[in-house]
């Protein structure tokens, strides 16, 4: 697994192999459906912040964890599952604890 220098501006797509970005577009678009403010004209491969709309009746955290687990299961990551969890803890409002996100993703693997 690769070690990346992740900053606040690092897009989620940077954690994945370049060759799989065409698959990743659909995955990130799916996640964008649950965000508070995601413009339809945004390049989803550049999204670096995931503020989920917990007040939306269509939002369920388990859907996000299932999608992230699916990404891990397809071996698209260039970083570890734990690093993805740390990224989501820092770049989303899903949960402040990377360990909690890690366990939640693992549950759906």
Predicted features along the sequence, with ranges:
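Flexible coil/loop and intrinsically disordered linker positions at secondary-structure junctions
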Residues: 2-109
């Amino acid at each position: 697994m690769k070690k990346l220098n992740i900053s606040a501006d690092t897009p989620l797509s940077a954690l994945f192999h370049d060759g799989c970005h065409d698959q990743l577009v659909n995955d990130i678009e799916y996640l964008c459906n649950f965000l508070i403010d995601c413009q339809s004209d945004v390049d989803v491969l550049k999204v670096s912040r995931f503020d989920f709309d917990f007040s939306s009746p269509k939002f369920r955290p388990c859907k996000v964890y299932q999608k992230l687990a699916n990404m891990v299961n397809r071996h698209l990551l260039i970083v570890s599952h734990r690093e993805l969890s740390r990224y989501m803890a820092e770049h989303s409002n899903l949960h402040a604890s990377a360990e909690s996100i890690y366990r939640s993703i693992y549950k759906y693997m």
